[in-house]
Amino acid sequence: MNQDPTQQLEPFLKRFLASLDLLYTQPTSQPFPNVESYATQLGSNLKRSSAIIVNGQPIIPSPQEDCKLQFQKKWLQTPLSSHQLTSYDGHLIPGTGTFVVHFSAKVRFDQSGRNRLGESADLFQENNSIVSKTNQRPIWGSWFGVDVNLVVDENVMQDGEIINSMDYRFTYVPNDSIIKV
């Protein structure tokens, strides 16, 4: 009996979204040795030569930095996020070894005023506060709607750089959010 080749897409998509939501300081696991090693894990499935579009704006590679690195740098500056996959559709393109995947998700952002590294724009940082930076909880805002189109290599069960193209687009922005996209 033939198995549906798209069956392996859902676990892959969940792993990819989890890579976009990584915490710099994980309370349950070994912390990252430095910011660079953390940043390289954000969207780690993207190929260095990936075509990346965010909200209709393409990320243009420079001679010094590829699209993946530029995306990771921009994503590092955003607040902490939490993605939730809502639906997906994928089609294997015969003879090419690639899937075309379209999925919808919800994402919410931390509205506490800190970026992914816990940095804020406060002029005076309280060094000896009762609550340390690692124990500060995110203040989640309302859910945004996201629509993503991917072109991925057929071997989606292997971790590695397998995303050839990504179009990440916000389809719903809540009125009560302080985050502007």
Swiss-Prot record:
Keyword vocabulary terms for this entry: Nucleus, Transport
Compartments, as annotated in UniProt: Nucleus
Keyword Nucleus found: yes
UniProt superkingdom: Eukaryota
A Pfam short name: Mtr2
Xref: Gene3D superfamilies: 3.10.450.50
CC per GO annotation: nucleus
Subunit structure, as described in the record: Interacts with MEX67.
Record's function text: Affects mRNA transport from the nucleus to the cytoplasm.
Full protein name: mRNA transport regulator MTR2
Native source organism of the sequence: Candida albicans
Upper lineage: Eukaryota, Fungi, Dikarya, Ascomycota, Saccharomycotina
